[in-house]
Amino acid sequence: YTACDSMTFMFDIAGSLLYTNYGDAFGTRNRANGNLEYVTLQFPIWRRYIAFSAGVMPYSAVGYTFTLADSLGSDYHYSMAYNGEGGFTQVYGGLSFNICDWVALGANIYYMFGSITQSRTLSFTESSLNTVAQSDNLTINSLRLRYGLQFFHTWGNHTVVLGGVFENRQRFSRSEYMQVETTTLDTVSTLSNAFEMPMVYGGGISY
């Protein structure tokens, strides 16, 4: 962030639109999907020594519906449905510091929130058989930290930059529900630390 000068203010927004045609043996369907990719801004706080950046970025999105109807012989007719919806979004803010002429140190704090629900339903046309449904819900509401370190050196018309980032792994909770009767919803389990973001580390060099 500190690479921007004292007169710089950057604002960036991006979106996407996807039009898709799906087809199988039973027919075709056209779908249009759009998404806000990110909104970010960046500006210096004090000359070229301290700079700030913030933004909103969707992290992931889920959206699908599949159905299948079949029968077991001529006596039992059933349908299966698979649904998924939701997503995660992260809001971040970051500071960077030029601690000397050739070293910069920075950190981003991310607030990630959202939920993803995936369900499976088996239903029968015969009233003597109960509908069975299972729903998995993953909810995230947590903070993450990512650190960065950068070394740079300039001589004449040449500049070499060496950088690295690190983020420790973060664990989240997961809830699972199962519905056995069409009118009864039972919580089977709530699992702590059942999902985690992996440790992140990386580096790069530019000339």
Could you describe each region identified by the protein language model?
Residues 1-207:
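Subset of outer-membrane beta-barrel
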